[in-house]
Amino acid sequence: MEDYNKIFDQLWQHAESEIVEFKKAESNFDFDELGRYFSALSNEANLRERDFAWLVFGVHDKTHTIVGTSYKDGEVALNKLKQDMSQHTSDNLVFREIVPIHVEDKRVLIFKIPASPRNIV
């Protein structure tokens, strides 16, 4: 099993990139906008020949301040989000994992996004 606290530390030490995005998303985030991020990050991972990309909720994208998030709190809500997203993406791509962790006593949500299929983008 992957150590998501360690992964977060590695992601957080660097600025955003084509395959890493940070968002505050303190309590809510528009589903359609989430879909656009999913698609863009998935395509960028493919173009950069990476297996996946990352979207992190609960971190201010400009200041890197950890603000925490209550977005989709609980396993049932996260599983429903995975299901809903798979129904709205081509090739039924779905988040590989959506993992809540705690950093500085605040909930942070890490989305592991698979690369889009090769030779399609």
Q: Over which residues does each language-model region extend?
A:
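Conserved N-terminal catalytic/coupling substructures associated with nucleotide/phosphate chemistry
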Residues: 1-121
